């Protein structure tokens, strides 16, 4: 009996010690460092409106359906963050072809003046997460004609807006040149109010 207690005692102490270290101490230290070093990222990269209300995150895409605004990538999960993921069909899968064709048909309805051959692939395909907040600058530019027509904002002004909102690759190495759709639409909204 004494032998069982002598074996059990260190096991319980080690378990409790690691429970406190890994479940309490480590998360508090990491959270503290994140808040000190990169507060915006640690808080979710939230975007606020003029009334200081949270309207979204730079990291999570939103579904813009109003034709006066720039549209982001297609989402198979309807931009529901709790269901992050995508079907990730293989290029040979007929379901992928059907979904892309459906996206192209939607595109043609809203942008009849833009040839389908000019539609960037990121406007008709899903991202891996289904929540991608960014599109390529070209994907933003092909929407300029529609937006200009509906908002009466000159095309040149919209093109400059896209350039102003374009971000380069992270550290000049990782990823591609991109435009955050939410931030772009917020700037567009300011132009529409003028």
From Swiss-Prot:
Q: Where are the transmembrane segments?
A: 14-34
Which UniProt keywords are given for this protein, alphabetically ordered? ATP-binding, Cell membrane, Ion transport, Membrane, Nucleotide-binding, Potassium, Potassium transport, Transmembrane, Transmembrane helix, Transport
> Which InterPro entries does the entry link to?
KdpC
Gene Ontology, cellular component aspect: plasma membrane
UniProt-listed Pfam families: KdpC
Membrane-topology descriptor:
Single-pass membrane protein
Location of the protein in the cell:
Cell membrane
Give a GO molecular function annotation for the protein: ATP binding
As for what it does, the entry says:
Part of the high-affinity ATP-driven potassium transport (or Kdp) system, which catalyzes the hydrolysis of ATP coupled with the electrogenic transport of potassium into the cytoplasm. This subunit acts as a catalytic chaperone that increases the ATP-binding affinity of the ATP-hydrolyzing subunit KdpB by the formation of a transient KdpB/KdpC/ATP ternary complex.
Question: What family is this?
Answer: Belongs to the KdpC family.
Q: How does it assemble?
A: The system is composed of three essential subunits: KdpA, KdpB and KdpC.
Protein name per UniProt: Potassium-transporting ATPase KdpC subunit
| Protein encoded by which gene | kdpC
């Amino acid at each position: 009996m004494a032998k069982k207690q002598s074996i059990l005692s260190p096991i319980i102490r080690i378990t409790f010690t690691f429970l406190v270290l890994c479940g309490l101490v480590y998360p508090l230290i990491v959270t503290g460092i994140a808040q000190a070093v990169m507060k915006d990222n640690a808080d979710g990269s939230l975007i606020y409106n003029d009334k200081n209300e949270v309207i979204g995150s730079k990291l999570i895409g939103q579904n813009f359906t109003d034709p006066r605004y720039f549209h982001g990538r297609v989402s198979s999960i309807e931009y529901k963050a709790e269901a992050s993921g995508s079907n990730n069909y293989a290029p040979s899968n007929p379901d992928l072809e059907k979904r892309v064709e459906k996206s192209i048909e939607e595109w043609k309805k809203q942008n009849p003046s833009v040839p389908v051959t000019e539609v960037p692939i990121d406007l008709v395909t899903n991202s891996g997460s289904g929540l991608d907040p960014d599109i390529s600058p070209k994907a933003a530019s092909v929407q300029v004609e529609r937006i200009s027509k509906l908002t009466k904002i000159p095309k040149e002004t919209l093109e400059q807006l896209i350039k102003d909102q374009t971000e380069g690759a992270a550290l000049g190495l990782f990823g591609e040149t991109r435009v955050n759709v939410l931030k772009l639409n917020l700037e567009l909204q300011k132009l529409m109010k003028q």
